[in-house]
Amino acid sequence: MRNMKVENIIKEKLSRRHLIKNAGKFAVGAAGLAVAASGGLSMLPSAEAAKKKSSTLPWPYKKFTPAEIKQAGEIAHDNWFKGFCSYATLSGIVEILRKKVGEPYLSFPMEITTFAHGGTSGWGATCGTLIGAGVAATLVAGPKTGEAINNEVINFYANTALPIYVPDHPKAEIKSQNVSNSPLCHLSVGKWMKKEGVGFLTPQQMERCARMASDMAMKTAELLNLWADGKFTPTVKAPVFANEIPSQNNCTDCHGADIPKTSGPFGTGLDLLKGGH
């Protein structure tokens, strides 16, 4: 009988010790369940919402102050020497929105546009600054309005004496501005180099192109601000509507007299050589 009492006392102590030892585990487990039930589970919809938000355009936008527009130019200028024209222009907009808005801009890989340097992989086609500007405008304003904004930026690029932007710390001194009459990298930089009297990949040419990225980033920010205020109104139509073919406004610079003719749905089937070119 005495042995049975001792045995029962030992079992009771062991049971109490086990309970005390595991009490902390039970508490942690209960706390974990409480967190999951309150905050943890609520994170799932938030994550899904963030994912949905990042995959749907347009993205959130907060207007740039005049100081931030200037900063966009500074960022674009500096980043040209890291990733060239398209990346530089895009980064001028996105880097500021990363600070002002956060996601989804924080997760956006700006390097996706580096291929567009030199008129797309060095082929001398559309200047990469315009591709970067178009991506930024589309992220913020959506595809339709983004394209209209980009069309305005292209018109500004082709018909303005550029570059305008002068950095506080230039990599080289340049003296010339030039109206390209074209969105093409080849014509734009080629005409400017001839006027400046320098060659390709000289410090002067690279500085010029960095400033072009600044000008396009700043112009894009200005137009996005107008859009945010409900005041953006397109002022020009893309040449395709006047020329009945995807085109620019100085075909003879490249084609001479051998310009493709067209007959399309936008007009009378004009000869591009006689159609204001």
Question: How would you label these PLM feature ranges?
Answer:
Residues 1-18:
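N-terminal secretory signal peptides
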Residues 13-18, 30-53:
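N-terminal twin-arginine translocation
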Residues 48-64, 222-228, 236-238, 256-277:
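Flexible linker/context regions in extracytoplasmic redox proteins
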Residues 55-84:
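Polybasic, low-complexity association/targeting segments
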Residues 73-83, 115-124, 201-205, 240:
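A short glycine/serine-rich beta->alpha loop
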Residues 84-141:
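Small-residue-enriched, tightly packed secondary-structure blocks
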Residues 92-97, 136-137, 150-225, 232-242, ...:
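Amphipathic alpha-helical interface segments
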Residues 248-258:
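The canonical Cys-X-X-Cys-His
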